[in-house]
């Protein structure tokens, strides 16, 4: 219905649709709208018993995708009454329920959504938020620094706690569990939590800074997750962690728990690339960012640009803006198809993690800004002089680059020289620069902007 007048309370969705040969794209869009709301494969007489014209989703616009033959952007509007208030499970059951298996479409991808203020007001939003987190950590004017304990699996609890202590003592703000460390036979969660918090408390006492460790509470049941989260709080942790794979209802439940108990909630996006990486089918990661901000997480991994994981510069910028802006406008180069008022939901902190090191610090600050957590796992644990030296190298690299930026220097162009100058009085930084130099994982991204040529990730 190209004449449909969009209401302020409508939920809007944009699908990238590749119809089967011979299928009209307008008909495909109409079928997507129908199947994701009220319709089935045939006319049913019970339609007469409902306000079907109100509840049926409306496909109101179909545009060809630039430079991509036989693929179309299909815009669909949903009435707000189609969705239960504050329930991601109900929302996603409609939006990504049956339609991705439609025979009439060869491929389908959910690119973006717009949520009305009336619906957002029914969601909690981040449990703590960036502003309160900075106040709690007493860290301002720079990105937060972290690292993931490596190796991911196999360490004993005591050795695990030693890694935590060394990293925090060296200058990091956070250490973290990785996505697949839960409560395995080689180290049960209680052992890991106890030794990790011993390391946190010791490092905090020595440094005079607030420190934290993301304790992964992911488990098989909600009862187990609550038990682990409560144990983390009893030990004095300020932050707990979950994985995306636990599901939307579990994520919202942990978001509510974190708000109730005044804890920061970190989300690892484990599993997202199974459906977000390919450009023609699945869903764009920016949609996951929006859902997770609504669900109540405080942190979410959102890309690095220069690291080892998928990350086009423009797309990453769009993800970060989605998590941090209170209001965003249409920005097609960054993949933002709708203006969005976030109804004062708190900011969700993007996390940059995966294949980054101190030699890239000028690039990271340029691309990602201050409001993020930069996590150097291998770039800390892999330092030749040890974990503490790796942490110190990252902290010195960050602070010298922030200082240069604040002095008005062209820190992007001068970045390598700024690091070399700082390394003259910091042996760990010099060792790190000698080892990793300017290594960058510069592969062509699979998910790139449709409306402009993508910039290179190298500076």
UniProtKB/Swiss-Prot annotation:
This is Ribulose bisphosphate carboxylase large chain. Pfam families: RuBisCO_large, RuBisCO_large_N. The lineage of its organism: Eukaryota, Haptista, Haptophyta, Prymnesiophyceae, Prymnesiales. Keywords: Calvin cycle, Carbon dioxide fixation, Chloroplast, Lyase, Magnesium, Metal-binding, Monooxygenase, Oxidoreductase, Photorespiration, Photosynthesis, Plastid. One of its GO terms (biological process) is reductive pentose-phosphate cycle. InterPro entries: RuBisCO, RuBisCo_large_chain_AS, RuBisCO_lsu_C, RuBisCO_lsu_C_sf, RuBisCO_lsu_fd_N, RuBisCO_lsu_N_sf, RuBisCO_lsuI. Disulfide bonds: none annotated. The keyword Oxidoreductase applies. Binds 1 Mg(2+) ion per subunit. GO terms for cellular component: chloroplast. SUPFAM superfamilies: RuBisCo, C-terminal domain, RuBisCO, large subunit, small (N-terminal) domain. It is found in: Plastid, Chloroplast. The gene is rbcL. Its cofactor is Mg(2+).
């Amino acid at each position: 219905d190209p004449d449909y007048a969009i209401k302020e309370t409508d939920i809007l969705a944009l699908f990238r649709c590749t119809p089967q040969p011979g299928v009209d794209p307008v008909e495909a869009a109409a079928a997507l709208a129908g199947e994701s709301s009220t319709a089935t494969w045939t006319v049913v007489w019970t339609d007469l018993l409902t306000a079907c014209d109100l509840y049926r989703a409306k496909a109101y616009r179909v545009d060809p995708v630039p430079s991509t033959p036989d693929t179309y952007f299909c815009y669909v509007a949903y009435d707000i009454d189609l969705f239960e208030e504050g329930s991601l499970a109900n929302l996603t059951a409609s939006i990504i329920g049956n339609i991705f298996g439609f025979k009439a479409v060869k491929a389908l991808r959910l690119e973006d959504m717009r949520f009305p203020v009336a619906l957002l007001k029914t969601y909690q939003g981040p449990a703590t938020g960036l502003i309160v987190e900075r106040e709690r950590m007493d860290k301002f004017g720079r990105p937060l620094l972290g690292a993931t304990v490596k190796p991911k699996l196999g360490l004993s609890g005591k050795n695990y706690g030693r890694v935590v202590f060394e990293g925090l003592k060296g200058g990091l703000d956070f250490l973290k569990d990785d996505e697949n460390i839960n409560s395995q036979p080689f180290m049960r969660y209680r052992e890991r939590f106890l030794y990790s918090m011993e390391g946190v408390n010791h490092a905090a006492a020595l440094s005079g800074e607030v420190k934290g460790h993301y304790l992964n509470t992911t488990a098989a049941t909600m009862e187990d997750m609550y038990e682990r989260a409560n144990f983390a709080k009893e030990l004095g942790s300020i932050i707990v962690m979950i994985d995306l794979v636990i599901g939307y209802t579990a994520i919202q439940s942990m978001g509510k728990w974190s708000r109730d108990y005044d804890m920061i909630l970190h989300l690892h996006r484990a599993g997202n690339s199974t459906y977000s990486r390919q450009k023609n089918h699945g869903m764009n990661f920016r949609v996951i960012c929006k859902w997770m901000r609504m669900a109540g997480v405080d942190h979410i991994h959102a890309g690095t640009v220069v690291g080892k994981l998928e990350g086009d510069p423009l797309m990453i910028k769009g993800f970060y803006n989605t998590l941090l802006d209170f209001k965003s406008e249409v920005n097609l180069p960054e993949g933002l198809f709708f203006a969005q008022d976030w109804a004062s939901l708190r900011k969700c902190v993007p996390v940059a993690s995966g294949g980054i090191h101190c030699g890239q610090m000028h690039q990271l600050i340029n691309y990602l800004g201050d409001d993020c957590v930069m996590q150097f796992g291998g770039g800390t644990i892999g330092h030749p002089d040890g974990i503490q030296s790796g942490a110190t190298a990252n902290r010195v690299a960050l602070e010298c680059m922030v200082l240069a930026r604040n002095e008005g220097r062209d820190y992007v162009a001068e970045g390598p020289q700024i690091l070399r100058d700082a390394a003259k009085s910091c042996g760990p930084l010099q060792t790190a620069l000698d080892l990793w130099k300017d290594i960058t994982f510069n592969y062509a991204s699979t998910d790139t902007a449709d409306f402009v040529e993508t910039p290179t990730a190298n500076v």
